[in-house]
Amino acid sequence: MNIGKIVQIMGAVVDVEFASEALPEIYSAVKVTVPEQKIDLTLEVAQHLGNNTVRCVAMSSTDGLQRGMAALNTGAPITVPVGPATLGRIFNVLGKAIDNGEEVHTDTSYPIHRPAPAFVDQDPSTVMLETGIKVIDLLAPYSKGGKIGLFGGAGVGKTVLIQELINNIAMEHGGLSVFAGVGERTREGNDLWNEMRESGVIDKMAMVFGQMNEPPGARLRVGLTGLTMAEYFRDVQNQDVLLFIDNIFRFTQAGSEVSALLGRMPSAVGYQPTLATEMGALQERITSTRNGSITSVQAIYVPADDLTDPAPATAFAHLDATTVLNRAISEKGIYPAVDPLDSNSRILSPQIIGEEHYKVARDVQQILQKYKELQDIIAILGMDELSEDEKLVVSRARRIERFLSQPFHVAEVFTGSPGKYVPIKETIRGFKEIVEGKHDNLPEAAFHMVGTIEEAIEKAKALGA
């Protein structure tokens, strides 16, 4: 009764005809299985066209499909395994393990389309999430259940920063992470998987991939698969979960491809008319509840560096903090190469983080801003032309700049220096002392790649010796 037949195939979109009483609902999964041709395809119902026909989006390649083939209405949406068994494994959009390991069997499966938590269940309080990374905690702090945009070009350290966040949350907070690779390079996913295994973090995270070579349906839905796995850890295990999405722009891009194939009229710049709705459906599920939280870090590609493009502009509306990585800073050998003046956070206010933290952060930014303004004069006329006050600002700014760097645990294998997790109190105290001029006598090199201010003092002694 619930078997239909394929009547039309247009690339990644397939029309299937059913008996009138057996029409599948929107978002239902429809399966096409032909063992002798090695076809095992899942479709998701997107539209009802009339005449008992539904239009579906394919989750994998439609190669080998023919009109007249049988399609089974499963009567349920795409469901994926959730729970502790997913940790340390890699999945595709359908929740099938793709790491050549054994099949994952869990007691519980969740549909990938779920409502966002009701307003009464959400936790209205804003609490800072300590990452142990000085530059982030001081100048652009993350909030539990918040959304963070990670901007940066190729090779400035996005992946290493993501790995360190996963490591610190796992080690210091015992928290779990889910990584969703959306429409990015398969090679990068493979590198990440190998690096996670080497750094020993893999047992604290689940990974879901729908990469560049996959059909748009898979790229559009893989973010929801990762989010669904994270929701289980939040709602059932009462965890604070980190959800990494790399790259949120590819989610929108896949939506645009699907929209065109479904015959919808394009909107501004050729994007889908449902752009804001699709983004909202994903982002609204990422939040804090009374049980736990999902904090999401989303890498955002900005097409042609145009921040007004509808795709990044729609993503911005949902963000609580932005972490901007700057190539000029990485060229100075300062890692993490986070731009202290471009990065910002909604929770950088005295009501949330406290008066002392706020004041130190603003003082640090003020000194760095003055230094930035003086750089042209220094480049043309040299340091000697500056007033005594300006020279003091420059010397403190250079110390602050270096003190914003720190050795990472996940980079220990390359650098040879042990990673440092710096508690927020130590971060505030260290920068406060530099701003107040207590360490003007220490050489600049003493502040580079250390954790706390005590380590800088020790390093200065070692340099002096």
Swiss-Prot record:
GO molecular function ontology, one term from the record: ATP binding
Designated name of the protein: ATP synthase subunit beta
Known EC number: 7.1.2.2
Role according to the record: Produces ATP from ADP in the presence of a proton gradient across the membrane. The catalytic sites are hosted primarily by the beta subunits.
Family the UniProt entry places it in: Belongs to the ATPase alpha/beta chains family.
Record PROSITE patterns: ATPASE_ALPHA_BETA
SMART domains to which the protein is assigned, alphabetical: AAA
Highest taxon, organism lineage: Bacteria
Catalytic activity annotation: ATP + H2O + 4 H(+)(in) = ADP + phosphate + 5 H(+)(out)
Matching SUPFAM superfamilies: C-terminal domain of alpha and beta subunits of F1 ATP synthase, N-terminal domain of alpha and beta subunits of F1 ATP synthase, P-loop containing nucleoside triphosphate hydrolases
Membrane topology type: Peripheral membrane protein
Residues annotated as binding ATP: 152-159
InterPro entries, per database record: AAA+_ATPase, ATP-synt_VA_C, ATP_synth_F1_bsu, ATPase_a/bsu_AS, ATPase_alpha/beta_chains, ATPase_F1/V1/A1_a/bsu_N, ATPase_F1/V1/A1_a/bsu_N_sf, ATPase_F1/V1/A1_a/bsu_nucl-bd
Oligomeric form and interacting partners: F-type ATPases have 2 components, CF(1) - the catalytic core - and CF(0) - the membrane proton channel. CF(1) has five subunits: alpha(3), beta(3), gamma(1), delta(1), epsilon(1). CF(0) has three main subunits: a(1), b(2) and c(9-12). The alpha and beta chains form an alternating ring which encloses part of the gamma chain. CF(1) is attached to CF(0) by a central stalk formed by the gamma and epsilon chains, while a peripheral stalk is formed by the delta and b chains.
Coiled coil: none
GO cellular component terms attached to this protein's record: plasma membrane; proton-transporting ATP synthase complex
Subcellular location: Cell membrane
Signal peptide (UniProt feature, chain positions): none
Root EC class: translocase
Main localization, broad class: membrane
Organism per entry: Desulfitobacterium hafniense (strain Y51)
Keywords: ATP synthesis, ATP-binding, Cell membrane, CF(1), Hydrogen ion transport, Ion transport, Membrane, Nucleotide-binding, Translocase, Transport
